[in-house]
Regions:
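Signature of the first transmembrane helix
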Residues: 1-55, 84, 210-237, 293, ...
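Short membrane-interface helical motifs at transmembrane helix boundaries
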Residues: 24, 82-102, 291-312
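Membrane-interface helix-loop junctions in multi-pass transport and translocation proteins
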Residues: 25-35, 90-101, 126-129, 133-181, ...
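Transmembrane helix-bundle signature of multi-pass secondary active exporters and lipid flippases
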Residues: 40-48, 219, 242-261, 292, ...
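Helix-loop junctions and terminal segments of transmembrane helices
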Residues: 48-66, 249-273, 342-343
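Membrane-interface junctions at transmembrane-helix termini in multi-pass inner-membrane proteins
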Residues: 60-61, 110-142, 269, 326-355
């Protein structure tokens, strides 16, 4: 029953991302919509810098009292708020109209992720997965999914009734709907602990957290590298079509994170070995993801039409969602067990795979441009080729060095 509930939460999160995108596409001009895409990309890339590995640091310190674990978490949260403030000021220079949204959402992401990892340190995986899927780079994923989903559905109804709503209302409503779900847990768990940041703690924290932070930053860059470049180089119509396809194709990966998270729990319980339960979750993940991908490629554009959103160029939309879907299913098929590399502390292997992606992506994009394949085509094809190599490397690393028997 708990697993089913968590799966529903993942479906809600996928719906939230889609509804938010569709509402902004209807509310904003193409130029403003392009800026909103830049906001989402900026959040995705900055979030792991803020989290800075605090969660895994808490878990990997071994058995300790709840008081010590939560004091460490409070230290990390305060440091995360400071980093959010610094990034918020940088965002003001880059995005003067939306920097306050970036700051608030970074703090929320930091809060929900740290609460999640505190529960994880107590082996309360159900609550941990409610507050986060274990990845600080995935934006604000928390128990606020349900309240945020209800808020966005309300916004959609208001829009259909032709009641005027604004982008600011949409973002602040999202922030508040998530905030109400994390305030109580934060107050309950952290208010009685004192902040105690020392030079020794900062050294240990930085040494332990840097690798995790770098990995999640690279994960985020890999997921958003194409839309990051497209949003700054392409014209607003291409950004419009590309981002719509990007959001739709991401649905299968969001569902996949549920099965991957459940598998990590089984992996730890089974002394870091692949058992039958993990294999079942693996095949279920592939099956569900494949069905979602097929459905998205067939009816994706009609889903947009149903909500009154029409791509500027339907050919661009369909081609992007097809290529992104191919990359997603390849990663799910090969990279599913590779997620265990994080648990087994194989940081070096993960970082090498990520850096190979970055180098290959930049190299292929430049080569495509030299060969005359310019614009969004070269970025999309470069991403796909690099993503396939990246997924294959993760698979080979785990099969060669991990406890892999299937």
């Amino acid at each position: 029953m708990k697993r089913f509930f968590l799966l529903i939460v993942r479906v809600f999160y996928s719906s939230i991302s889609l509804i938010f995108t569709l509402l902004t596409a209807k509310l904003l001009t193409r130029d403003d919509y392009k800026q909103s895409v830049e906001l989402i990309v900026a959040l995705s890339i900055m979030a792991p810098i803020v989290s800075f590995g605090i969660g895994p640091l808490i878990v990997r310190k071994g058995k300790c009292s709840t008081q010590i674990a939560y004091r460490r978490a409070l230290n990390g949260w305060c440091l995360g708020v400071l980093l959010s403030l610094i990034l918020g000021l940088i965002s003001y220079w880059l995005y003067p109209d939306i920097y306050i949204y970036i700051f608030m959402l970074l703090v929320l992401n930091n809060t929900s992720f740290i609460i999640s990892e505190c529960y994880r340190s107590q082996n309360d995986f159900f609550r941990a997965l409610l507050f986060s899927n274990g990845s600080p780079s995935s934006g604000v994923i928390s128990l606020g999914i349900i309240s945020n989903f209800l808020f966005l559905v309300l916004c959609a109804i208001l829009f259909l009734l032709k009641i005027k709503i604004t982008f600011s209302f949409l973002v602040w409503g999202t922030i508040c709907s998530i905030l109400i779900t994390v305030l109580y847990d934060f107050y309950k768990n952290f208010i009685r602990f004192r902040l105690r940041i020392t030079n020794k703690w900062l050294y240990i924290y930085s040494k332990s957290g840097f690798n995790i932070s770098l990995i999640y930053f690279l994960f985020s860059f890999i997921s958003n590298s194409d839309i990051l470049i497209i949003s700054h180089l392409a014209d607003q119509n291409i950004v419009y079509d590309y981002s719509l396809a990007f959001k739709l194709s991401a649905s299968c990966l969001i569902i996949h994170t549920f099965f991957a998270s459940m598998s990590q729990v089984e992996f730890v319980k089974n002394n870091f070995l692949i058992n039958l339960a993990i294999k079942k979750l693996y095949f279920t993940s592939i099956s569900v993801s494949l069905l979602v991908i097929i459905a998205l490629n067939i009816v994706g554009v009609y889903v947009l039409h149903f909500f009154g959103v029409y791509p500027h160029n339907e050919h661009v939309f369909r081609w992007v969602i097809l290529i992104k879907s191919l990359g997603a299913i390849f990663y799910i098929a090969l990279g599913f067990n590779a997620s265990f590399l994080l648990i087994t502390n194989r940081f070096k292997n993960i970082i090498i795979s990520c850096l190979v992606f970055v180098i290959l992506f930049i190299s292929v994009a430049c080569l495509s441009y030299v060969c005359g394949v310019g614009g969004w085509h070269s970025i999309l094809y470069s991403w796909l080729m690099s993503y396939l190599v990246y997924s294959l490397l993760l698979f080979l690393y785990f099969k060669r060095k991990g406890n892999y028997n299937g």
